[in-house]
A protein has these predicted regions:
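SAM-dependent transferase fold signal centered on methyltransferase-like domains
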Residues: 1-86
């Protein structure tokens, strides 16, 4: 399974609704982009890790990485996770 989430202002909010659609027992990749407050990057990583694990992600590899500045206080990030949902 491969899921692209291109809703930069709402990616994180919609992620929980999208995870139940992922196929089980097979490797999957989720990639998305988000605009967040600069200081929230560690919290976003923790929130997504917990969300993915709660939905049964095993062998989880998550990257939340700043791509560029969006404004004085916000950044544009790339989110990528690979996992197998069980």
């Amino acid at each position: 399974d491969f899921l692209l989430v291109n809703l930069p202002h709402q990616t994180i909010e919609h992620m929980e609704d999208l995870l139940p659609l992922m196929k089980r027992e097979t490797p999957s990749l989720i990639r998305g982009w988000a605009i967040i407050d600069r200081d929230d990057l560690p919290g976003v990583n923790d929130k997504l890790t917990n969300l993915l694990l709660h939905h049964g992600a095993a062998n989880l590899r998550l990257i939340c990485q700043e791509i560029k500045g969006f404004s004085a206080t916000k950044i544009f990030i790339r989110i990528e996770s690979s996992q197998t949902f069980i």
